[in-house]
Amino acid sequence: MSVVSPDPAPVPHDPQRRALLRWLVGGGALAGGLGVSAVAQGYRFGVTHEQWNLVGLTRPVRLALLTDLHYGLYIGAGSVRRWVDATLAECPDLILLGGDLVDSHFDAAARPQQTAALLAELGRLRAPLGVYAVWGNHDYGSFGRSISQSPEASRADWAARRDALRAGLAGQGVTVLLNEGRSLRDDLWLGGVDDLRMGEADSVAALRGSGTRATVLLAHNPDVLLRLRSAPGLVLSGHTHGGQVRLPLLGALKVPADPRFTMGWVRGPQGIPAYVSRGLGMSGLPVRNLCEPEITLLTLLPPGA
């Protein structure tokens, strides 16, 4: 005698369960799509054109500001090549590199080919008034900690890396300014300071000798605006990445500086103007959202022009 199993009981229709499943599947797909988009946004960039009337200037000057390259971990020579090509296409009078040239995980001595590739690309930068750079905290080997918390051997190792990188850059025509300045024209002085947190930033030394010239101070960290002991006509910074990840209505989730100085045109408490670049590279995670990497092409004009 055969036994026929009864049909399984039908699963009751549960609208809430189906809605939850749809939400989970849709939410997962959305999160995945946003993740892919955030990674893609991190590798796109644009050229931002800005103007500023600078006291003391007698004729215009066009400068390009590239900052926060973070070469090494997520950024390779191909990205740097595209940035250099875009910069040269603008034919600036002056090119400035605003620090964090390499990522804190990058060991130049252990990766000589990568280091040579970086120097070769940056060596293509040419401008009538020169190419200048300053150090950022990642050039000190720091990702969010004080240099004083690092072991002595680690600090010595990174000092040697910076010395080697500085010499390599000099060989390619890029001058790193460490609390010093240069007279670029009879009406223009450029000063550059060491990193605010990891080094010893001295704006007075950087602007010493500027006289009556218009003054531009290159400083990686915009928080230098809170500690200035001099009064430059304009400060140019990076460091913040514009927050790197921004959300609609909320803005930046985290800013490694005074939140008043997240990005764009800002003023310090003394009224000194500054432009804070969103930078080009990434740190922490290889993502950006609503915060496109930028090269800033800044035209400085005489007052009233």
UniProtKB/Swiss-Prot annotation:
Query: Which terms are listed as keywords in the entry?
Result: Hydrolase, Metal-binding, Signal
GO molecular function terms listed in the Swiss-Prot or TrEMBL record: metal ion binding; UDP-2,3-diacylglucosamine hydrolase activity
Co-factor remark: Binds 2 divalent metal cations.
Q: Give the range the annotation lists for the signal sequence.
A: 1-40
User: PTMs?
Assistant: Predicted to be exported by the Tat system. The position of the signal peptide cleavage has not been experimentally proven.
Give me any GO biological process, just one.
lipid A biosynthetic process
What this protein needs as a cofactor is:
a divalent metal cation
Q: Which residues bind a divalent metal cation 1?
A: 68, 70, 100, 241
Q: Does the keyword Nuclease apply?
A: no
Positions of a divalent metal cation 2 binding: 100, 137, 239
- Domain of life where this protein originates: Bacteria
- Please give the Pfam families that the UniProt record associates with this protein: Metallophos
- Keyword Lipid metabolism recorded: no
Recorded GO CC terms: membrane
Q: Known PANTHER family for this protein?
A: PHOSPHODIESTERASE YAEI, TRANSMEMBRANE PROTEIN WITH METALLOPHOSPHOESTERASE DOMAIN-RELATED
Q: So what family is this one in?
A: Belongs to the metallophosphoesterase superfamily.
- What is this protein's record name? Uncharacterized metallophosphoesterase DR_2345
Species, as recorded: Deinococcus radiodurans (strain ATCC 13939 / DSM 20539 / JCM 16871 / CCUG 27074 / LMG 4051 / NBRC 15346 / NCIMB 9279 / VKM B-1422 / R1)
